[in-house]
């Protein structure tokens, strides 16, 4: 039941241009056997189904709304059970995975604090610099604007330096 609703098979681009995964501006993550598609594809797949359900509701297409809402609910459950471990860790210990789980409110209530803790740990380990790719950097900014609780994140976004890859 879980694997069926984790859209993580076949070719997936995942997140790319993560500074720590680049070498002189060339993205190296595609060469890795396990890349960010382990979390990007399932989470953005869930988001697409959620958007479809919301759109169907706006258009008054009740049967389509129920259909996509059911898929989105099953996908959210699969993400919570199959991607987020008991300690709130994601399949790849990348900042972007935690950003998406927080921003899309996919974490079960009992794991929200530990997921936020993993994100803060990753930021601290990286010298208070962000290490997110093009998919999650925008989400980081949008989330920090809406949440006064992301003061560490705001500090990392305002840094004038970068530590890895093409941003050296």
Regions found by a protein language model. Give the residues of each.
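Active-site core of glycosidic bond-cleaving carbohydrate-active enzymes
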Residues: 1-168
